[in-house]
Each structure stands twice: as structure tokens, then as C-alpha cells.
């Protein structure tokens, strides 16, 4: 006689806990085995990336590097160095300032290329603007005629230099510069006696193509100092340090006498301005706004 399986209370037959767990385990194994099997299947070879077109966009640093090397092949009197800075690209990171300090082994307080900051607007509509300010390398530099020993002068290529061996530290040129682009080096050593001495105390600088060891008494200690467009790098066919480290690609450099150079192209834009043009200094640093 067959066993009667109907329950008198009307409920369906129950499922044991062991049977339920076994069924769940089988389902989980099936779910996992699908992706594993797919992953184990041999992948097809990726399609090769298309070749970059030869006439594609050129890296601006490479273009400016070529501009510099082309200019250096000319006599010094036939080139005219200039810089353009796109203020729309500047993010105020001060990478250019730090690169300049590292390149020229500058002590605290001697800054060739600060990034000036300005807050504009009213709360809550406030924004900040940044303006890198190197030496303007003026065509009519007011710092030159005030030097009593002719230690500062304009080279044929437009760079305004300081002859450290002739400078007497009178600082007349610092007062005469309307851009605040010159600072005095008092020869201080700020980390003497500390565990970590700074680079400017232990490593020589190579400004103007010479080696300057810092001892607190000899040049450039006691001299006026300023940006010189990294002339020692230019003479080696390299761009200024501030140009190569700009995060936003906001700084451009080259020969204004070369119509093929990038800086010549940018300086002719309608949105270009120069600082304090009303003074007649004719700065060679152009700002795109």
C-alpha cells in the first residue's frame, strides 16, 4: 500500500535544511563557473593602434627647442630673445619659480621669477589671477644708465646682464627697475649648523656661463641679481628652466627676429599686452590675456 503523503493540515511537504543548502551550493558553483570559463578562454589578439600621422600636432616644447637651436646658429646681433606668457593657462602652481631657484641655486629672498597673485571680485563671486613676473629684458632698460660702474648692460641679443665681478652692490638698479625684477643677495647662509644644508650653500651656480661658488664674500654675494632668461642654458641650445617646467604650457620663448618661431607668432596676437608700456621701457615679455 503506497504511503499517503497529503497532510491533513493542508500544508505542502517541507524541504529539509540539508537539501536546501545543497541546491544553493550547486547554483552558486554554476554562477561562478561561467565567468571563470570565459576568462580561461584564449583572448583574441588586440587590434594594432593606428600610426600617428606624420603631419600631426607638434609638441610645443620641441618646437621651441628647435627655435632656440636655429637662433643660436645666427650671430648674436641677429637674434632677439623674447618671452610670451599666456595668463589664461597659468594655474599659479609656482613650478617655474621653483625650477628657477633650483637651476640658479638661489638663496632665500632672491627670486628671479615670482608668481604674483591677485584676488578679484566680491564674495561669493571671487576668483584669483596669477601673473608670472620674470625680468622684462627691456629694450630701454632703466636699470642700465643708473649703474655707476656699468656692471649691468644689454647684450646685442637683448638680454640684460649683471657683471658680478664689477657690481659694487649699490642697489641703484634695484630702485630704478619699475617691475621689481631685481633683488639683492646679502650672502647669507640660512641653514648653517642644521642637519640639512640647502643646495645654494653647497653647490655652485652656473649663471652667465661661469661657475660661482658661494662663500659669503665673493660674487654673487653682495650683488644685485635678476632673471637672465637662463642664458647659460641658451648657449647650450636649451630652453630656460621656467619654460620646460611650466605645468600648463603657459610660457613660450624664442627669437623675435625669426618669423617662424612660436614666440614671434604669439607676440603678434591681438590679445597681447605688456606691463607698464606707458613708461617707454619696451619690455620683451608679452602677456596673452
Predicted regions mapped to residue ranges:
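C-terminal segment of N-terminal export signals and the immediately downstream linker at the start
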Residues: 14, 34-83, 278-280, 286-289
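Short functional micro-motifs and their immediate structural scaffolds
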Residues: 95-101, 105-108, 143, 152, ...
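Long, compositionally biased charged/polar accessory segments in the mid-to-C-terminal portions
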Residues: 232-289
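Non-heme iron-sulfur electron-transfer modules
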Residues: 49-55, 59-63, 102-131, 153-166, ...
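N-terminal secretory signal peptides and thylakoid transit peptides that target proteins
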Residues: 3-28
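Mature N-terminal segment immediately following signal peptide/propeptide cleavage
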Residues: 75-98
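Short cysteine clusters
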Residues: 90-96, 100, 135-138, 143, ...
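Twin-arginine (Tat) signal peptide motif
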Residues: 12-21, 39, 43-47, 96, ...
Amino acid at each position: 500500500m503506497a504511503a499517503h503523503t497529503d497532510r491533513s493540515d493542508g500544508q505542502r511537504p517541507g524541504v529539509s535544511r540539508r537539501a536546501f543548502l545543497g541546491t544553493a551550493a550547486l547554483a552558486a558553483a554554476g554562477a561562478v563557473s561561467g565567468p571563470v570559463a570565459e576568462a580561461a578562454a584564449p583572448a583574441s589578439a588586440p587590434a594594432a593602434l593606428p600610426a600617428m600621422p606624420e603631419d600631426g600636432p607638434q609638441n610645443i616644447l620641441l618646437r621651441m627647442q628647435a627655435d632656440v637651436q636655429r637662433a643660436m646658429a645666427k650671430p648674436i646681433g641677429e637674434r632677439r630673445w623674447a618671452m610670451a606668457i599666456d595668463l589664461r593657462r597659468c594655474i599659479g602652481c609656482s613650478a617655474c619659480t621653483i625650477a628657477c631657484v633650483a637651476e640658479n641655486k638661489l638663496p632665500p629672498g632672491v627670486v628671479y621669477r615670482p608668481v604674483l597673485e591677485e584676488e578679484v571680485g566680491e564674495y561669493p563671486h571671487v576668483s584669483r589671477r596669477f601673473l608670472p613676473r620674470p625680468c622684462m629684458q627691456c629694450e630701454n632698460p632703466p636699470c642700465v644708465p643708473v649703474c655707476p660702474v656699468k656692471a649691468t648692460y644689454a647684450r646685442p641679443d637683448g638680454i640684460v646682464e649683471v657683471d658680478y665681478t664689477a657690481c659694487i652692490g649699490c642697489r641703484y638698479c634695484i630702485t630704478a627697475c619699475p617691475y621689481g625684477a631685481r633683488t639683492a643677495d646679502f650672502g647669507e647662509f640660512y641653514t648653517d649648523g642644521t642637519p640639512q644644508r640647502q643646495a645654494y650653500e653647497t653647490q655652485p651656480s652656473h649663471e652667465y656661463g661661469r661657475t660661482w661658488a658661494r662663500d659669503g664674500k665673493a660674487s654673487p654675494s653682495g650683488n644685485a641679481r635678476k632673471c637672465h632668461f637662463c642664458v647659460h642654458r641658451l648657449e647650450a641650445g636649451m630652453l630656460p628652466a621656467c619654460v620646460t617646467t611650466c605645468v600648463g604650457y603657459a610660457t613660450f620663448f624664442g627669437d623675435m627676429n625669426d618669423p617662424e618661431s612660436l614666440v614671434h607668432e604669439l607676440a603678434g596676437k591681438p590679445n597681447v599686452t605688456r606691463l607698464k608700456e606707458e613708461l617707454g621701457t619696451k619690455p620683451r615679455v608679452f602677456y596673452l590675456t
